[in-house]
Amino acid sequence: MHFVRQLTVPAPSDRVFAYLSDFTTTTEWDPATVRTSCISGSGGVGTRYRNVSSFLGREATVDYVVTELDPGRRFALRGENATLVAHDDMRVQDEGVGTTVTYTATFELKGFRKIATPVVAPALKRLVDGGADGLRRALQRL
């Protein structure tokens, strides 16, 4: 399942990127996130985060690793647990009078759970939409 959300905010791109590339800020903008902690690293490629989110009435833990970091422009992570693999890609574009963020989230259910994809897809869409709305509000406060 692949979701792309784009939003433009008045905040300067350097502040937007600094905020996004600290994945622990998900607790401030993603309504599904219960907590996110940095397990190892200092934010660069290879940094590991543990995210606990509430999804369909249950808490799920996903361990993420930063896979791409192009300072000021792109931040990408790969997350995994026993049931899914997730890829989050955040791209930042300076618009002169604001910043456009393109947020791409991809989820792949593992094993026999793949057959549940059509059932889970609407809930994941709501999850991504809620995250994008929360992200817009958080970035507008920068």
Model-derived features with residue positions:
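Amphipathic alpha-helical segments that line or abut small-molecule/effector binding pockets
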Residues: D14-F17, D129, D133
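Hydrophobic ligand-binding cavity/cleft-lining segments
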Residues: M1-S37, G44
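Hydrophobic beta-strand positions in extracellular immunoglobulin-like domains
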Residues: V9, S53, A105-F107
